[in-house]
Amino acid sequence: MGRVSAWEALLLGVVEGLTEFLPVSSTGHLTLLFHLLGLPVEEDPFLKTFLVAIQLGAILAVLLLYGRRLAADRALWLRIAVAFVPTGVIGFFFYPLIKGVILGNDAVVAFFLFFVGAVLLFADRLAERAQYQDVKALPLARVAWIGVFQGLAALFPGTSRSGATILGGLLLGLNRQAAAEFSFLLALPTMFAAVGYDLWKSAPEVPEGGWSLLLLGFLAALATALVTVRWMLAFVARHGFRPFALYRMALAAVYAFFFLR
């Protein structure tokens, strides 16, 4: 079952809940944290299952916060579906081709942490003149392009799913809050599909005593994500995405220090 302890499970769940919906790359943070804790995530099947469990906890937070709104808003569901289609197509056709080439490549992670941060700085300035205050006003062709951004994020580690979708929303004319909210909502079909399948496939391999650690990490991620999603909307309304962009660029340097020496 690896060497993960209860406090490590709690810490990892909190970090996932904090970073999954911020444009800072949750994968980059978790990879760095696993390294600092000395946990061999690439070699331990249980740790891979644990990662899936905490991601599921984080995405459930969005469903709890937006479930009622989604149930009554078909126009919003249409846009989620339109954006999800190119994401699925890109993932289906291209992910298997590059999986063994760049996934797990630390230089690629460091580069995209920095690159997306730099582009996010530019896009955040565009948001000051945003044309659309609600994703339902965004033309469907532009909505589909946000899905393309999300699909590309799955191909290039360090990009960040939320970072890519927020960046796409800003570049395509959404204001900051609308871009952030649509990023949250677009995570629902994308992550539930991927995470649910992975968890179902790996559940029989969970050893005795492992379920309590999975539950601890799941609940920690859920609780933290509930707070983070609410906080982020208020934060970007006041400060924009510039602080996140600068943070990404600094994190790229830290990541390179630990993994590229």
UniProtKB/Swiss-Prot annotation:
Protein family (similarity comment): Belongs to the UppP family.
Enzyme class: hydrolase
MF annotations from Gene Ontology: undecaprenyl-diphosphatase activity
HAMAP family: Undec_diphosphatase
Topological relation to the membrane, as annotated: Multi-pass membrane protein
Sorted UniProt keywords: Antibiotic resistance, Cell inner membrane, Cell membrane, Cell shape, Cell wall biogenesis/degradation, Hydrolase, Membrane, Peptidoglycan synthesis, Transmembrane, Transmembrane helix
Note: Bacitracin is thought to be involved in the inhibition of peptidoglycan synthesis by sequestering undecaprenyl diphosphate, thereby reducing the pool of lipid carrier available.
Location in or out of the cell: Cell inner membrane
InterPro entries, A to Z: UppP
Catalysed transformations (reactions): di-trans,octa-cis-undecaprenyl diphosphate + H2O = di-trans,octa-cis-undecaprenyl phosphate + phosphate + H(+)
PANTHER family in the cross-refs: UNDECAPRENYL-DIPHOSPHATASE
EC number(s) on file: 3.6.1.27
Protein name: Undecaprenyl-diphosphatase
Domain of life: Bacteria
